[in-house]
Amino acid sequence: MGLDVDSVPIAEAAAPSSMAATEPPADKIAQLDRDASNVAPMNTDSSRETMPTSPRALEPAQVTPLSSDVAYEGLVQGKDPSDDSIIAATPLQRTFSTVAPTMTTQPNRLQLIDEDQQFHGAEFNDHLKQWGLSDAGFGYDICAVLGSQSTGKSTLLNRLFGTNFDVMDERARQQTTKGIWLCRGMDRNVLVMDVEGTDGRERGEDQDFERKSALFSLATAECLIVNMWENQVGLFQGANMALLKTVLDVNLSLFQAGRARAGSAKEKTLLLFVIRDFIGTTPLANLEATIRTDLQRIWASLTKPESLVHAELGDFFDLGFATLPHKVLQAKEFDADILKLQRRFIDRGDESYVFKTEYHKRIPIDGLPHYLEGVWEQIVQNKDLDLPTQQELLAQFRCDEIATTASLAFSSAMSALRAELDAGHVLESLGNDMARHRSEALAMFDKDASRYHQVVYARKREDLLVKLNAALLPFFLCQLKNLHNELTDQCKRVIQEGTKQPAYNFGLLVEEGITKAMRAFDDETARLVLPETDWKVDDERAQLLDELHTLARTLRANETRKLSIQLEKDMRRELADPVELALSQPDISMWNNVLSAFHRVNEQVANMYRTRAASLNTTPDEDTTAVAQLQQASWRLLLEKVHEQTSETVLASRLRGYFEDRFRYDAGGVPRVWKPSDDIDDIFVKSRDATLALIPLYATIQPDDPSLQMSVVSLVGAPEESLETPSYDEARHVLSERKCAEIGQRFRREADAAYIEAKRGTVSSMSQVPIWMYGVLVVLGWNEAMAVLRNPVYFTLLCMVLATAYVIWRLNLGTPVLALASGMTRELRAFGEEQLRTYLDGTPPSANRAREYRVPSGSTAHVSEKTPHRPLTTSGAAEADTVEDSHPRLPASF
């Protein structure tokens, strides 16, 4: 919004003011001090210090850039100018008639700013000397007046301060004061500022100067007199409320915001409303309330800077009110009230005293010309005061309305496309649709808005175009995102489909996919980028190209990984049979056979990889790395297979088989049938020792050919090159000493069991039944056999039994018949027990019979109640007989 007024430089170094003026006599100073001591103190902070009473204390030594927080060294002896005691130091320094001699003639006035907004500061210092204020230091005040043209502002100032501003000729109402005039009040250290009136017919709608002059008065004066007629109170334009609103708004942003950010003290100004032609019908209190309400409403409507969001009107302005009767019709009353109002500017003891310490701007008098010039330059350069005329206001209002209507129609037309874009679709006609809807909105605006102020129309059209482009930007970005995703997927599909062909070149597939995707991107974005926009697609294009290359690298890595996995499967399959066969035939060349198979498989896999990797467009370094990884993987697979074949279970089985081949079979492979004459002990010891000798052979990978060992070391690499793959030295020890001892101990137990079994076989062969025993059985049983065969009844029964047994066996009815027989036996036993119990107890059978439940298969299930009965034993032992068979008894066939 603008610089803080405190930052406006006065001068690099102001010439020291001449204090060659004769000091007042000591008796005069003492008299003035005695007179001033009877005046009530000003409303200042209780902590402020009191300055020395000598006028020399006001002599400035150097002018520095204006800032309320900068110390003006030498301005006051030993005092900080930010201290209010400089301004309210003593009655001598703040009394209007003490610093300069009394003027008996009217002072010359100075046109500070002319009607063309030109600042005249060349004669300022000369006028200060003529007015006797060049040595005033801080002992001066500034008062300005604001009001409508021809309302008696200059007359009021002349009567209050004894100035000689031009007044209007009452015979013709026309502009009198042009620009801003400055004059010293007679016998007072007051600079009075007469400001050109507002709402004059000479300037018409051009309100630029009146806003700038009002802001200048508000920013520089301690007291701003707002001159108005009584019948203007409550009006917005007539009471200058519109002007005050603009001035207050710019004053906040231009002058006060910088102070708030810097932490400086807030400057306050007194707004003294002088109500002219007051007749008393409406009490002053009511008029005062109306004005206060209007000002509070204006303050609430201002857009405040961030640092002053919570600021109140009272933080920057105090309000004062005074009334004056009609100057012509009530001349005596007017003169009397002028004297009363005059005392408020003179009498420090008056409770309504105007020039209080907190209103002073803390600018020394010798730096005032530069300060005022800097403030005016800042106001002139500020664009916030260049407000439009009525025609421009109308054009702004109507153009805004038309632009809003066009924007709504545009948004409604574009909303239908949003859903499809959000769904991830690429709209081929989006560029044409956006251009068409934007052109329609601009045409709608041009049709109605082109009739208004052309400058406003052009500016608003540009604003509308910017707004429409901003509304289209999300569609543009969403289309780019969808296009990015679609082209990435398309390129991925092209590459993946190409890799499914029997013979393909991965590099050509990648180049083809990327070229096709980038061509489609360029074609679509050429239709998508609209004229009169600053849209660029360079970043999105570079991002898409990077992602496609990343995708190609990822797909190539996937293909390489799949190739490696397939080759590892082939290695596992190719290593399984040779290694297992070599380890199943333990001899001195066992590890030679294993490592030879390992080298053969490694060479085959490396050749297969190089052949198939040629189509993947891999680099030589990548091929070397992949082959090394495959070789390490093959070493891990070999170790895995070796450990599998030398596990405790497998190795124990293999040792047992090796032992049995030598113990249970002869040299020709014929199973041995042990005879008492065989030397079992010698055969056992030889077989056992030969088998135990295999354990150290399995325990360590130790080929007879040193070249095989060296080749494995070169393939596997050093231990630090791979943390996952063990080195040859780490992996060559297959079985630990403890594991070897455990396996040997287990084998010995199994061998001992085989030895004992063989020994038992020889003993059992010696203890067989003699053959002659069978002859004895035939001789002794001959008579019984003949008796059965010769007796028709026995023979018939024998035949029936044999026939029944044959049928049962033939029909596989043995189990059901046995189950039926068992069930009948249980039933008969239960029936017998029941009959016997009935006989012994003398109770009817129905009372003691257990409930029976028949199952579909014909078996009986007993569920008996626990009925106590007498013991059946004759020994008299007390038994609690209870039928506890609560579960069904099913046939044995179940």
Swiss-Prot record:
Question: Which residues face the membrane's Lumenal side?
Answer: 790-792
Compartments in which it is found: Endoplasmic reticulum membrane
One Pfam family, please name it.
Answer: RHD3_GTPase
Q: Which SUPFAM superfamilies match?
A: P-loop containing nucleoside triphosphate hydrolases
Q: How does it sit in the membrane?
A: Multi-pass membrane protein
Top-level EC class as recorded in UniProt: hydrolase
Naming one, the record's GO cellular component terms include:
endoplasmic reticulum membrane
**Coiled-coil region(s) at which residues?**
536-559
Q: Which residues form the GB1/RHD3-type G domain?
A: 137-359
Q: Compositionally biased, Polar residues: which spans?
A: 40-53
Q: Per the record, where are the segments of Low complexity compositional bias?
A: 9-24
Q: Which CDD domains match?
A: GBP (cd01851)
InterPro entries according to UniProt: G_GB1_RHD3_dom (IPR030386), P-loop_NTPase (IPR027417), RHD3/Sey1 (IPR008803), Sey1/RHD3-like_3HB (IPR046758)
Is Transcription regulation one of the keywords UniProt gives this record?
no
Annotated transmembrane regions: 769-789, 793-813
Any one Gene Ontology MF annotation carried by this entry is:
GTPase activity
Gene3D superfamilies registered for this protein in UniProt: P-loop containing nucleotide triphosphate hydrolases
Family statement? Belongs to the TRAFAC class dynamin-like GTPase superfamily. GB1/RHD3 GTPase family. RHD3 subfamily.
What is the role of the protein in this entry?
A: Cooperates with the reticulon proteins and tubule-shaping DP1 family proteins to generate and maintain the structure of the tubular endoplasmic reticulum network. Has GTPase activity, which is required for its function in ER organization.
Q: What is the protein name stated in its UniProt record?
A: Protein SEY1
State the taxonomy lineage: Eukaryota, Fungi, Dikarya, Basidiomycota, Ustilaginomycotina
What is the gene called? SEY1
